[in-house]
Amino acid sequence: METKISVLIIEYFAVKRKLISDLINSSPKLQVIATASNSKFATNKLKKHKPEVILMNLEENNIKDILFLEEKNSLNKTIPIVVTSSNQNLINIAASKGADDLILVSKNKKSHEIKKEQIINSLLAYGSISIKNKIACNKDMKTKNYERANFILNHKNDISSLNQLEEHAKEKTLNEKEIKKLKLRKFDIIAIGVSAGGPVALKSILPEIPESFPPIIIVQHMPKGFTEEFAKNLNNLCKISVKETTNNEILKQGYAYISSGGYHTKIKKIDGNYQIKTLDGKHINGHKPSIGVLFQSIAEIAKDKAIAIIMTGMGNDGSREIGDIKKAGGLTIAQDKESSMVFGMPKIAIKENNIDYIVPLSHMVKLLKAILINS
């Protein structure tokens, strides 16, 4: 018999806890193993039951439970959490605190029933990832990989490799000579594509980026209405300015632009300046905004003046299009398996030989500084 994905539910009202539990248990692949009325009880049950995925319904009556997102990270960073709420502001806050998926529901009694398919699909996706992570987890190997990566990036005179952590990719080398060659190049723009696990990953790297960096355009898979607040929250953490994309805006050094939810983002070049072009239209690779759309535009317009980075995420959005940037002469980087919450998009990009360098999240900015900052 197939093992079911275990779910912990956090919901303030007992009646609604029962409704949500019944909804989840209606799936033959899911099983509610524990419920909690607040974050205090949830913390205890998390330790006891060790679920594969958590569903939190966040509303104004339990707003303090937002702190559970931070508490959960200190207890077990590998357990994904899906947040539902009828409050847009709370959804935005949850995104900034590292929720893995966000589902806006209505305020009526059947709010979760209406979004049943989306909720179940999200729990199945993240629960499956959690199970795979448990199986693959080897703390000794992980420690060795990070120690090796740390040695590589902190010993410039003896850089023999920037890591090959995926069996299908060729080992990438970056020595002093190659760094010097990269330093001679002029990079005008950095493009980042990220999905599941992105809010936490971006919160980790963006505060390290100096104002001297070229403009950064980021596609984080988020629906319409979420990205403005997400950008504001990141802006409060960073030296650079972080904002949501605006159509026809000129890209500036020291800025990061979060692609507006519900729209695709491209770039164009007018009078020597890169400008943002926001577009409506159908979903591409299952997403709007699509990483693939941005990367194709970067390949066509910025060409060898671009650095493209593909990070944690499910699926293949951007995985093939980043190869267009490589073919155009741009520099391509992928987040490694060990530091990716979901090693989907980077894995496919690596398999298809679309990546120049593979690095841990904790060393991403160190690599960029080595290339972009003259010393």
Swiss-Prot record:
Organism for this UniProt entry = Borreliella burgdorferi (strain ATCC 35210 / DSM 4680 / CIP 102532 / B31)
User: Which terms are listed as keywords in the entry?
Assistant: Hydrolase
- Its protein name is Probable protein-glutamate methylesterase BB_0415
Which segments constitute the CheB-type methylesterase domain? 183-375
User: Per the database record, which ranges form the Response regulatory domain?
Assistant: 6-120
Q: Name one GO molecular function term.
A: phosphorelay response regulator activity
Quick one: a GO biological-process term for this protein?
chemotaxis
Reaction catalysed by this chain? [protein]-L-glutamate 5-O-methyl ester + H2O = L-glutamyl-[protein] + methanol + H(+)
Enzyme Commission number, as recorded: 3.1.1.61
**GO CC field:** cytoplasm
The top EC class, named as a word, is hydrolase
List of catalytic residues: S195, H221, D317
Cited InterPro entries: CheB-like, CheB_C, CheY-like_superfamily, Sig_transdc_resp-reg_Me-estase, Sig_transdc_resp-reg_receiver
